[in-house]
Protein backbone atom coordinates (compact mmCIF):
# COMPACT_ATOMS: atom_id res chain seq x y z
CA UNK A 1 0.00 0.00 0.00
CA UNK A 2 1.24 3.43 -0.90
CA UNK A 3 -0.13 6.93 -0.44
CA UNK A 4 0.72 9.32 -3.24
CA UNK A 5 0.62 13.04 -2.57
CA UNK A 6 -0.06 15.28 -5.54
CA UNK A 7 1.52 18.72 -5.68
CA UNK A 8 -1.20 20.31 -7.79
CA UNK A 9 -4.76 19.75 -8.95
CA UNK A 10 -5.27 17.38 -11.84
CA UNK A 11 -7.67 17.71 -14.76
CA UNK A 12 -10.02 14.96 -13.60
CA UNK A 13 -10.35 11.51 -12.07
CA UNK A 14 -8.58 9.78 -14.97
CA UNK A 15 -5.59 12.12 -14.70
CA UNK A 16 -5.39 11.56 -10.95
CA UNK A 17 -5.50 7.78 -11.38
CA UNK A 18 -2.81 7.94 -14.08
CA UNK A 19 -0.37 9.25 -11.44
CA UNK A 20 -0.58 5.91 -9.60
CA UNK A 21 -0.18 3.59 -12.59
CA UNK A 22 3.61 3.32 -12.34
CA UNK A 23 3.26 1.88 -8.82
CA UNK A 24 1.03 -1.01 -9.96
CA UNK A 25 1.99 -4.32 -11.51
CA UNK A 26 0.71 -4.78 -15.06
CA UNK A 27 -1.11 -8.04 -14.29
CA UNK A 28 -2.92 -7.05 -11.09
CA UNK A 29 -6.62 -6.22 -10.85
CA UNK A 30 -7.24 -2.51 -10.31
CA UNK A 31 -10.29 -1.17 -8.48
CA UNK A 32 -10.89 2.58 -8.65
CA UNK A 33 -13.44 3.82 -6.13
CA UNK A 34 -14.72 7.35 -5.54
CA UNK A 35 -14.40 8.60 -1.98
CA UNK A 36 -17.89 10.09 -1.67
CA UNK A 37 -20.06 6.97 -1.79
CA UNK A 38 -20.46 3.44 -0.55
CA UNK A 39 -22.28 0.25 -1.49
CA UNK A 40 -22.26 -3.47 -0.82
CA UNK A 41 -20.75 -5.78 -3.39
CA UNK A 42 -20.21 -9.51 -3.74
CA UNK A 43 -16.53 -10.18 -4.49
CA UNK A 44 -17.37 -13.55 -6.05
CA UNK A 45 -19.44 -11.64 -8.61
CA UNK A 46 -16.41 -9.47 -9.42
CA UNK A 47 -14.23 -12.53 -10.08
CA UNK A 48 -16.97 -14.04 -12.26
CA UNK A 49 -17.39 -10.82 -14.29
CA UNK A 50 -13.62 -10.45 -14.80
CA UNK A 51 -13.52 -13.87 -16.47
CA UNK A 52 -15.84 -12.48 -19.14
CA UNK A 53 -15.01 -8.74 -19.24
CA UNK A 54 -11.87 -6.57 -19.23
CA UNK A 55 -13.55 -3.64 -17.48
CA UNK A 56 -16.53 -3.62 -15.13
CA UNK A 57 -18.46 -0.46 -14.24
CA UNK A 58 -20.36 -0.28 -10.98
CA UNK A 59 -23.89 1.09 -11.32
CA UNK A 60 -26.98 1.53 -9.19
CA UNK A 61 -30.62 2.23 -9.84
CA UNK A 62 -31.12 5.98 -9.94
CA UNK A 63 -32.71 7.91 -7.11
CA UNK A 64 -34.83 11.03 -7.38
CA UNK A 65 -31.76 13.21 -6.84
CA UNK A 66 -29.99 11.53 -9.79
CA UNK A 67 -32.95 12.03 -12.13
CA UNK A 68 -33.42 15.68 -11.14
CA UNK A 69 -29.69 16.34 -11.62
CA UNK A 70 -29.06 13.92 -14.47
CA UNK A 71 -26.33 16.08 -16.05
CA UNK A 72 -24.14 15.55 -12.99
CA UNK A 73 -23.95 11.80 -13.66
CA UNK A 74 -23.05 9.34 -16.36
CA UNK A 75 -25.71 6.77 -17.18
CA UNK A 76 -25.59 3.12 -18.18
CA UNK A 77 -27.93 0.81 -20.06
CA UNK A 78 -27.74 -2.41 -22.05
CA UNK A 79 -28.25 -2.07 -25.78
CA UNK A 80 -31.52 -3.84 -26.57
CA UNK A 81 -30.09 -5.55 -29.67
CA UNK A 82 -26.43 -6.28 -28.89
CA UNK A 83 -26.89 -6.51 -25.09
CA UNK A 84 -23.63 -4.58 -24.73
CA UNK A 85 -23.19 -1.95 -22.02
CA UNK A 86 -23.59 1.64 -23.24
CA UNK A 87 -22.57 4.77 -21.35
CA UNK A 88 -23.96 8.27 -21.75
CA UNK A 89 -21.53 10.83 -20.34
CA UNK A 90 -22.97 13.40 -17.93
CA UNK A 91 -26.52 13.17 -19.28
CA UNK A 92 -29.20 10.49 -19.19
CA UNK A 93 -30.21 8.65 -22.35
CA UNK A 94 -33.26 10.10 -24.11
CA UNK A 95 -35.33 6.90 -23.87
CA UNK A 96 -36.38 4.94 -20.78
CA UNK A 97 -34.78 7.44 -18.42
CA UNK A 98 -36.06 5.70 -15.27
CA UNK A 99 -34.74 2.30 -16.39
CA UNK A 100 -31.18 3.51 -16.94
CA UNK A 101 -28.68 3.14 -14.13
CA UNK A 102 -26.38 5.75 -12.66
CA UNK A 103 -22.65 5.10 -12.96
CA UNK A 104 -21.46 5.50 -9.37
CA UNK A 105 -17.82 6.34 -10.13
CA UNK A 106 -16.26 2.98 -9.26
CA UNK A 107 -14.53 0.80 -11.83
CA UNK A 108 -12.76 -2.55 -11.96
CA UNK A 109 -10.04 -3.26 -14.52
CA UNK A 110 -8.80 -6.77 -15.21
CA UNK A 111 -5.27 -5.40 -15.05
CA UNK A 112 -3.20 -2.22 -14.98
CA UNK A 113 -2.37 -2.45 -18.68
CA UNK A 114 -6.06 -2.16 -19.63
CA UNK A 115 -6.53 0.83 -17.33
CA UNK A 116 -3.38 2.48 -18.69
CA UNK A 117 -4.40 2.02 -22.34
CA UNK A 118 -7.89 3.38 -21.64
CA UNK A 119 -6.60 6.52 -19.92
CA UNK A 120 -3.89 7.12 -22.52
CA UNK A 121 -6.50 6.90 -25.29
CA UNK A 122 -8.71 9.65 -23.89
CA UNK A 123 -5.75 11.87 -23.05
CA UNK A 124 -4.05 11.40 -26.41
CA UNK A 125 -7.33 12.23 -28.17
CA UNK A 126 -8.13 15.07 -25.73
CA UNK A 127 -11.52 13.55 -24.87
CA UNK A 128 -12.63 15.80 -22.04
CA UNK A 129 -16.11 16.25 -20.62
CA UNK A 130 -16.78 19.50 -18.76
CA UNK A 131 -13.06 20.23 -19.18
CA UNK A 132 -12.02 17.09 -17.26
CA UNK A 133 -10.72 13.63 -18.09
CA UNK A 134 -13.24 11.22 -16.59
CA UNK A 135 -12.76 7.49 -16.12
CA UNK A 136 -16.38 7.26 -17.29
CA UNK A 137 -15.10 8.35 -20.71
CA UNK A 138 -12.11 5.99 -20.59
CA UNK A 139 -14.41 3.01 -20.09
CA UNK A 140 -17.06 4.25 -22.54
CA UNK A 141 -14.55 3.88 -25.40
CA UNK A 142 -13.38 0.43 -24.27
CA UNK A 143 -14.95 -1.44 -27.18
CA UNK A 144 -13.31 0.97 -29.65
CA UNK A 145 -9.87 -0.01 -28.35
CA UNK A 146 -10.59 -3.74 -28.09
CA UNK A 147 -11.85 -4.28 -24.55
CA UNK A 148 -15.05 -5.88 -23.29
CA UNK A 149 -17.18 -3.84 -20.91
CA UNK A 150 -19.41 -5.35 -18.24
CA UNK A 151 -21.55 -4.04 -15.40
CA UNK A 152 -22.36 -4.87 -11.79
CA UNK A 153 -25.54 -3.31 -10.41
CA UNK A 154 -25.18 -2.75 -6.67
CA UNK A 155 -27.81 -2.37 -4.02
CA UNK A 156 -27.66 -0.13 -0.96
CA UNK A 157 -25.74 2.55 -2.85
CA UNK A 158 -25.30 5.72 -0.79
CA UNK A 159 -23.72 8.92 -2.06
CA UNK A 160 -22.73 12.10 -0.27
CA UNK A 161 -20.94 13.77 -3.18
CA UNK A 162 -23.13 16.84 -3.54
CA UNK A 163 -24.09 19.43 -0.95
CA UNK A 164 -27.73 18.30 -0.79
CA UNK A 165 -26.77 14.60 -0.60
CA UNK A 166 -24.34 15.31 2.23
CA UNK A 167 -26.93 17.42 4.05
CA UNK A 168 -29.46 14.56 3.87
CA UNK A 169 -26.96 11.74 4.51
CA UNK A 170 -27.91 9.33 7.30
Where are the language model's segments positioned?
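Conserved beta-loop-beta/alpha segment of the NTase-like Rossmann-fold superfamily
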Residues: 1-78, 111
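Catalytic core of nucleotide-sugar-dependent glycosyltransferases
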Residues: 170
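Catalytic-core segments of class I nucleotidyltransferases/pyrophosphorylases
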Residues: 47-48, 80-160, 164-167
